[in-house]
């Protein structure tokens, strides 16, 4: 199983949005992320990097 840590970045600040992510769905700028326990978050932005070897996904979050 490939699980990832999702990092969100707004301007210069980067934070962990979710650990142990098992699913990512993208619809335009809406990104839905679900972890292995079924918890789901939704963020607006764009995926900027996916590193499957190191289980990292980086998202530039939209300014709201």
Give residue spans per PLM region.
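Short loop/turn microsegments at loop-to-beta-strand junctions
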Residues: 28-29
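C-terminal structural segments of small proteins and small subunits
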Residues: 10, 39-64
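Short, acidic, Ser/Thr-enriched surface-loop or helix-capping motifs
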Residues: 35
